[in-house]
């Protein structure tokens, strides 16, 4: 599909690249926990409106997040092997064009949230703020992954607000679980760029953890599973939910086989594998309510 766009509409291609529409992994990593929240908040039968709005919102806000991230990193991406081909780094698009695209995506997201209730509307501003803040945190903290986790998890309280009109305690427990998971998988992602980031003075948990990176990832993944077990216990879930968590744990084990030598591309594939971890949890959740 995207090869056709690149050949037929070459002027659109840099915008697609900037929004990462050709690389859906980020959308999937944002989508799975959003669906967890939507399904739990709706007790297995969420509103179709909520499903559609949050699905489209995930696609739009992930695209917007990529745009503002590349805008923030435009002076660094050309010096990092993995990001040298990004449109702002190559000059295919200007900073002004990126900001205009970000504004347009923000307006689309704003239009979507108008279909939901007032509490969800006000919560959406928190999500926007976190999305804008995250890319710039790499300049002043070794924990930008924590800010990414906060941003990537914000759809969880929003989903509960949209379905139930409130944000109960269980929503925040699910939020914490997803923040922990996000920090774990984005540390794997940061391992790919560690050498380049050290040269450029860019901060990350991969640099902060140093030789303890694999241990810290394992601890974060274990805490993720513990938090999700607590979610299941509080909701009275049975074997389908826990079977999904077994699937997630097997995915985590496979990832550790990939990152054992801390090589760039195996670490990237470990990051990609998290899509299956999130999918396992949702499949278990779906059959829990089936």
Swiss-Prot record:
Its cofactor is Mg(2+). Pathway: Cofactor biosynthesis; ubiquinone biosynthesis. It comes from the Bacteria. GO terms for cellular component: plasma membrane. Its EC number is 2.5.1.39. GO terms for molecular function: 4-hydroxybenzoate polyprenyltransferase activity. It catalyses: all-trans-octaprenyl diphosphate + 4-hydroxybenzoate = 4-hydroxy-3-(all-trans-octaprenyl)benzoate + diphosphate. InterPro entries: HB_polyprenyltransferase-like (IPR006370), Prenyltransferase (IPR039653), UbiA_prenyltransferase (IPR000537), UbiA_prenylTrfase_CS (IPR030470), UbiA_sf (IPR044878). Keywords: Cell inner membrane, Cell membrane, Magnesium, Membrane, Transferase, Transmembrane, Transmembrane helix, Ubiquinone biosynthesis. The chain crosses the membrane at residues 40-60, 99-119, 120-140, 142-162, 165-185, 215-235, 239-259, 267-287. It is a multi-pass membrane protein. It is found in: Cell inner membrane. The keyword Ion transport does not apply. One of its GO terms (biological process) is ubiquinone biosynthetic process. The keyword Flavoprotein does not apply. Catalyzes the prenylation of para-hydroxybenzoate (PHB) with an all-trans polyprenyl group. Mediates the second step in the final reaction sequence of ubiquinone-8 (UQ-8) biosynthesis, which is the condensation of the polyisoprenoid side chain with PHB, generating the first membrane-bound Q intermediate 3-octaprenyl-4-hydroxybenzoate. Belongs to the UbiA prenyltransferase family. This is 4-hydroxybenzoate octaprenyltransferase. The gene is ubiA.
């Amino acid at each position: 599909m995207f090869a056709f766009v690149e050949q037929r509409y070459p002027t659109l291609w840099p915008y697609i690249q900037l929004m990462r529409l050709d690389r859906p992994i980020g959308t999937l990593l944002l989508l799975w926990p959003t669906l967890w929240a939507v399904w739990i908040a709706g007790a297995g039968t969420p509103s179709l409106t909520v499903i559609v709005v949050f699905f489209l919102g995930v696609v739009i806000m992930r695209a917007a997040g990529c745009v503002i991230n590349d805008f923030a990193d435009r002076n660094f991406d050309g010096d990092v092997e993995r990001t040298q081909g990004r449109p702002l780094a190559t000059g295919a698009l200007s900073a002004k064009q990126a900001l205009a695209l970000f504004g347009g995506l923000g307006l689309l997201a704003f239009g979507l949230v108008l279909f939901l209730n007032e509490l969800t509307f006000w919560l959406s501003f928190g999500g926007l703020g976190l999305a804008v803040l995250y890319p710039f945190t790499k300049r002043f903290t070794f924990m930008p992954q924590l800010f990414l986790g906060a941003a990537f998890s914000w759809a969880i309280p929003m989903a509960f607000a949209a379905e139930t009109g409130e944000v109960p305690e269980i929503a925040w427990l699910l939020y914490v679980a997803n923040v922990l998971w996000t920090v774990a998988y984005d540390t794997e992602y940061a391992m790919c760029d560690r050498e380049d980031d050290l040269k450029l003075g860019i901060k990350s948990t991969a640099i902060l953890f140093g030789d303890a990176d694999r241990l810290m990832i394992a601890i974060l993944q274990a805490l993720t599973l513990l938090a999700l077990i607590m979610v299941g216990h509080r909701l009275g879930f049975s074997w389908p939910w826990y079977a999904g968590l077994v699937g997630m744990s097997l995915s985590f084990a496979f990832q550790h086989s990939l990152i054992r030598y801390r090589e760039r591309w195996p670490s990237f594939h470990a990051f990609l594998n998290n899509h299956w971890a999130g999918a396992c949890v949702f499949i278990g959740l779906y059959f829990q309510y089936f």
